[in-house]
Amino acid sequence: MQIKEIFMIRCISCLSVVLLHIISMVLMLQAEALADISHTVDSFRTLLMFSTPAFIFISEFLLARSYPDGVPDGFLKKRGKVIFVPFLFIAAIDALLMTSAMGGEVTFLAFVQKYLANVFLGNFIGYFILVIFQFYMLHMMFHEYLKKASPKWVLSISFVVTAAYLGYFSAASPAPASEEGGAFPFFWVPFAGWLFYFCLAYYCGKEYKRFLALLNQYRWVVYGAAIASGALVVTVSYVGEIGMISSKRPDIMLYSTSMIFLCFHLFSKMKHVPKIMMFISNYSFSIYLLHAYFMIIGYVLLLNMPEIPAVPAVLLLFAVCTAGPIMTSWALNKFKYGYLFVGKIYQPKQKKVTVEVRDHAG
């Protein structure tokens, strides 16, 4: 069967991440011109924060749906080739670019330090892959327990753990990702900050049909929760003490969950996935992993176009940072081992009128 909701959510999530980062860059470069609406822009940026949790949620959802009784032999080896090896390569590229951008001579020691921080601490855009691999390990170790345990208890406990974890570090480490300050600057990588999403995705994927039926039965609750949680995160962004624009906030956890439910409910009503959405979904991993580096091109473009208004600037960068990763991934995947550098392009297997999705859990 075709889990069309997955393709739609994956597409929307990766595009939302790109848009979020582009708006942040334009806001930084045009800070004076946009000063009067900066709060409004920040609120909109906050509303895009569901994207990374939703993208990561999909990985465990597909595992639970495809492998409820345990993953097949060679699972981690296969995932390592198509996901983790590209992660290591892009981590090296990022380390080289970031150490070069710091000015002065690029030393081997500085490169190694940044590379190790990228790989082990998730100190770059690819941190989400570390979270996904933790989900793989958790699924392999605990799927038997989760099958037997009460979902109400598991979800309740995991919700409290994740909310407490995010709440503490949101207060203790308010510094942005680029600033290594606070109690633990890379708190978003350990699974505790994502445990609720993992448990929720497991049960939603395992009981997919029942999950959709419940969403349909309580659809007005789903609509209301999305609106209420959206209003909450906007309010917190305006007046709350937890003012950082980040998906690693306890209120964002509520909002992201509501948006995931809303997307599953709405997209379950679709008869088919639009071709453009399917196309972008198939390249979503590469877009997510590579778009930040095409923003360097966008940065140079905007520096040479100081008079360009904010909206055209966002549209220009959005085109560059979406098309760039797609073309790069397409070109490298023409070579036998090109996927080892940028990830494999997902190609749904057609079986008459059905689409099998289990070979791409992330």
UniProtKB/Swiss-Prot annotation:
- Transmembrane annotation, as ranges: 11-31, 44-64, 82-102, 119-139, 153-173, 181-201, 220-240, 252-267, 283-303, 308-328
Keyword Phosphoprotein tagged: no
Has UniProt tagged this entry with the keyword Transmembrane? yes
What's an example GO cellular component term for this entry? plasma membrane
This protein's source sits in the domain of life called: Bacteria
Q: What does the record give as EC number? A: 2.3.-.-
| UniProt family annotation | Belongs to the acyltransferase 3 family.
From the Swiss-Prot or TrEMBL record, give the protein name: Putative membrane-bound acyltransferase YfiQ
- The organism's lineage? Bacteria, Bacillati, Bacillota, Bacilli, Bacillales
Q: Which gene encodes it?
A: yfiQ
